[in-house]
């Protein structure tokens, strides 16, 4: 069965306040539905989208909600009281591709244009973002395509701790499916009237029960329940973000610091960057990301990694696991064939790992922006305080600024010729508590000032919680030298991890003092390198090119700044072009400087 749009069922009757009465009705409804199909035989046609059906009360409402949650075919509860209200708006309202077109189980025609990147890989063309106002009444946000007259009179039903709102996703790579299903049980604000609302791209199959939604795994050809965070509404987050970006002149922060905080706290930027790498923020809005969803994404990637690294790669298993990942972490592929997006190489796995890492940082940033404990402060100043960092802008004519500019210029690798970088601002930075934790490693020796780069989306999380090591759920194969924090002595090696683009040229870089101690030097990658030999404090991935050691600067307290011009070391024949430094204890890291830069991309004729 294929449908476009949505359906609504109404229920007239008083709400049952005693839990046992509700359970009794549900048991009765369950028996009736299990003994015979509702509304006819197995081949009976379903009601067309837009019907409003009368149900007998909240019990029938909840039963219908749960029945629709994992439908094979939808048989609406039959009643003699058919309401006349129509919801044609659901048919005509602009929607995403999945809701606006019927998708078949077979291959879909490619109706989207694609661009080629420098390596010849297809990239999904970025679509202009449409801003949709969310309406939150009660615990959850009403779906954006519910008619306005319903929004003004109804809210999402909540019974105890149960919030009857579900967003589901199903991706089946082999069948070229990438489908969503949204369902909400609605109660009138005045009480006594109820509705079930649903919107979908295609209808799925049974077998995931509402009671087991949180602990359920992904199954082939089944919908996967996406856990939402029912914290502050997106509307509030957007309001605070707007205040941050539009009121720079009112803050008591120094102007350069205020501009930087505004840059890294921009939710619109975060959404756009995620859209550019394929994430579908319409199906699972960034503001509703839950920690458990992110950990599930890591877990699926870990299982994909195990298959890829196995002796015999099972293509069928990779298809199933890829579908599971896209069900947990929704993507927007337009109408491209799903077979093009199977995660079957270490490179594709690493790209998805970086996406989930970015989503993890965004989840932290969203929580910061929703925190209203400092509402008496200007929004920018409130965010500044949450970072627990002191930022001191460096003057262009200062010795420190000159030293850092030299370090940046000298260590731009010859193989990274696709861009140049302009410094916007450099800040001296100090995180609360870092110096004290770092002190126990200060006597270990071999302290270096090294580069670290990351996506612009990640910096609110990094500055508020510090640099962190990937969780146990993350696949170890995504990290060349095991799970740790990675640094470089070549600026451009770290700058590449900023993932800047023509659409977003801003980047942020850290210079950290890192207590390396005695290093375990490796010429080739080793996923188990985090199990350091006795006496070693860090790993050095030895590159063929490094800054001239003789030109390094040593500070008064003994920290080495490798700002010399790069030179090739003939005796080195490893797999790395440039050095990498990895520590596995975040107490060995002390942030010293943070740079805001602009990337200038060269155009090739």
From Swiss-Prot:
Keywords: ADP-ribosylation, Glycosyltransferase, NAD, Nucleotidyltransferase, Nucleus, Transferase. One of its GO terms (cellular component) is nucleolus. It is an enzyme of class 2 (transferase). It comes from the Eukaryota. Coiled coil: none annotated. Residues 250-370 form the PARP alpha-helical domain. Residues 96-122 are annotated as: Disordered. It catalyses: NAD(+) + (ADP-D-ribosyl)n-acceptor = nicotinamide + (ADP-D-ribosyl)n+1-acceptor + H(+); L-aspartyl-[protein] + NAD(+) = 4-O-(ADP-D-ribosyl)-L-aspartyl-[protein] + nicotinamide; L-glutamyl-[protein] + NAD(+) = 5-O-(ADP-D-ribosyl)-L-glutamyl-[protein] + nicotinamide. Residues 108-122 have a biased composition (Basic and acidic residues). InterPro entries: ARTD/PARP (IPR050800), Poly(ADP-ribose)pol_cat_dom (IPR012317), Poly(ADP-ribose)pol_reg_dom (IPR004102), Poly(ADP-ribose)pol_reg_dom_sf (IPR036616), WGR_dom_sf (IPR036930), WGR_domain (IPR008893). Pfam families: PARP, PARP_reg, WGR. Belongs to the ARTD/PARP family. PANTHER family: DNA LIGASE (PTHR10459), POLY [ADP-RIBOSE] POLYMERASE 2 (PTHR10459:SF60). Involved in the base excision repair (BER) pathway, by catalyzing the poly(ADP-ribosyl)ation of a limited number of acceptor proteins involved in chromatin architecture and in DNA metabolism. This modification follows DNA damages and appears as an obligatory step in a detection/signaling pathway leading to the reparation of DNA strand breaks. This is Poly [ADP-ribose] polymerase 2-B.
